[in-house]
């Protein structure tokens, strides 16, 4: 049942100004409720806006309705990671050796060790290999060991996403290219290959197989038969092109790319061997990531799921994704006062639930903590749109927020600074989980009706923001 909240601030204003102010308060509530009705969204919509200085709720509609947060939950993951790891935390990737290099040969073991860096890419790996070549390494006669157990191996984030979705990859202590591999093909699928492209390097990936088949649907199939195997419909490859596909077994993929880059530099390696415990060894190369605050800034801007899961797992120290999500859920309840059900750190899982009021109170509480004081600066700045839908770039109202989208789910939460200097915190959610569940998994990349539904949800969000921007 729809509900509207009038705060003590509105009541006191009414008592001080006779009968006019209460009418104004009722008019405001009716206006925002009318915006919800005008959006004609199926499912549930709820919102909440509060004064940051006082914590008073100024306007709300179904603020306690549980809804999937989608990627909006990355704001909570950001607070969690900052609290547990600190803004200056760096993830390191290392190449180590158990013996010195002698006349170009390493008679001992060479170890590629991942420290959980979610931003490692092919060019970074290539620079590490180039440094090995400059150090004189030409051949390894011992073993090539690969350590990725700094984080647990996760095959995929959510199992109700189309198998080919590049935003649903595996998670590992050793990551590369957001844990995706690039499928490239020529016209009609005459040739197709997997690559791990960077700007400076283009290694071909042989360990993940691709086969072009003569069928119309499904476009992709995936199987795991000792190696990752994909098939793709020839009908879908009419024009030359490429697309990213998710990698499920991440560490072997990174190991292969590393070995290929070594070969390109004239360094010969034996086949890789995965290990779960690092032996005593001397670092040859140490590659640090950017500071965590920079990683989180990029994560919030591009809504990178694998980054959210990686930093969440690093923060919790848990050995499975469900356990890690539960740890963040408990922390958010205890520290931020957020009552939620969380199944991951990215919001990709559709069974997570938050409320609009809970989200508002959580981000306000988080920003007041020393560890979360920089949250607003990390959130993406967005612009209000005018009645024609054109962004009002550089306008007097400053908004920093995190958006989130799943099939028939759309959310936005963050902070507004009004021209008067007044700070507001807000959360807006619309969701129709039943409609989402009715869509077959293989159709969930572009389900019928999704685009129009999300467009209406975003019109609602902008309308609410425009309305709240007029508050004194």
Where are these predicted regions, by residue range?
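N-terminal secretory signal peptides and thylakoid transit peptides that target proteins
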Residues: 1-19
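Small-residue-rich helix-loop
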Residues: 316-430, 435-472
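Mid-domain, small-residue-enriched loop/turn segments at the edges of structured enzyme/sensor domains
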Residues: 44-46, 103-175, 179, 315-358
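Beta-lactamase-like hydrolase cores
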Residues: 25-69, 87-88, 126-135
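A conserved catalytic-loop motif detector
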Residues: 147-209, 351-395
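A small/polar active-site loop signature that marks catalytic segments
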Residues: 209-374
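Active-site SXXK
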Residues: 55, 69-87, 144, 174, ...
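Short, well-structured active-site flanking segments
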Residues: 83-98, 270-274, 372-376
